[in-house]
Amino acid sequence: MTIFQNHMLFRFSAAVAIIAMTVNTAYANSSQAGIAPVAATTLKESILFAIDRDPSVSHQAAQLGIGQAQIDEARSGWMPQISLNGSTGHSQTTDSSGSLRNSAAWGLSLTQLIYDFGKTNNSISQSSAQRDSYRFQLMGTLSDVAEKTALSYVEVRRYTDLLQAARENVQALKNVAQLAKLRADAGVSSTSDELQTRTRIAGMQATVEQYTASLNSARARLAVLTGMQAEKYSPVPANLAVEQDSVNRIDYSLIPAVMAAQNMERSAQYGVETAKSQHWPTLSLKGGRTRYESDNRSYWDDQIQVNIDAPIYQGGAVSARVRQAEGARAMASSQVDQARFDVLQKASVAQADWTGARGRMEAGRQQLESALRARDVYKNEYTLSKRSINDLLSVEQDVWQATSAKIIAEYDGWSSAINYASAVDNLMPLIGIEKNAAAKLPDLS
């Protein structure tokens, strides 16, 4: 690993530690836009760098910080509320003993909540559940970035192998052209064999250029995601392979999207309780000391009182808020079912695609073996004038089609495996990024 890579890994680990400890706005280094050249990289390193750069991670981390601040705001309801107050201007009080004209007043007041039938506690619990939902959404964002990066990585590997196979096919066609030239020079075949082969080579060169352009595009996309341009990309880890019938063993309780929806449902339930508690009174202690400046004399007014605020009739506003909260809870509950449904659908489709790609890959492998055997036989028979140049070119086309089909099927399979692992929130552990369940955030090594 290069010095640049070590530095970036350290920076990313530090950034995640900051989020875990402070739950505040995130990575100061995620705004980097530069792309650094490196000799080689792996899928794990690419994902780590992408998470360090992706703005969506910082965005969701900031949302988590907002959630924590909302908890602090709700908890402040139990703290004493202290304020200074003052006024100036004409004020007159008249009673049986006469009139008192005040010109100014100032003082200090304090209010302490005693009991509110769950209003404040439910608000705290509601904000806590919402904060936990934001935490799981952050986990989901990390998984989404990992999936996006892994799919881009697979595309780079796909076009790297296709380009290499196309170049090998060009070289094979050049060997055929050389053989045709030798036979033409010896007078045992016409020069049209060589010309026909050159035409086929030109067509294959166009395919090479096409895959070169596709590879450059894939490398550019991955470079923007990771912030580095590697000369070599390691193979996709084999442990990403999808197990048969694994879709029937999905543990939804460990999937961030489901857990985020469940916590939003829990938050909505506390919202219902908060709305219902508005029917009940609020008991508080109020105290104050106020100085009045009057024409006749100045004096202090001290007070300490137990205050009760009990709603009697508000035009149905509280009942309407309860119904709104119950509707929000029903919506949140449906989101839990939707999250499970989305996970199952994505995982099921990915598993089916994986199985299909494995089958196509095996068929391509068998086709390639047959084409390679036919190539050797046809070359020998061509030198003995038992085969035409068209037979030789046809078998080279068969070799190319089998090779490209095998490569395409292989990387279609890896894309499906990545989609499956992301659906069940197992992508990062499979590539070596361990997750700390207690902290509910990835612990990157």
Please annotate each region the language model reported.
Residues 2, 141-254, 350-353, 357, ...:
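Periplasmic alpha-helical coiled-coil/stalk elements that build and connect Gram-negative outer-membrane
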Residues 2-4, 8, 27, 35-36, ...:
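Acidic, low-complexity, intrinsically disordered peripheral segments
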Residues 13-24:
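Bacterial N-terminal signal peptides
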Residues 28-83, 226-269, 273, 312, ...:
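Bacterial Sec-pathway N-terminal export signals of envelope proteins
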Residues 42, 81-141, 259-340, 346:
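Small/polar-residue-enriched beta-strand and adjacent coil segments characteristic
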Residues 59-74, 141, 145-168, 175, ...:
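Amphipathic alpha-helical coiled-coil segments
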Residues 89, 95, 101-102, 206-209, ...:
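Outer-membrane beta-barrel domain signature
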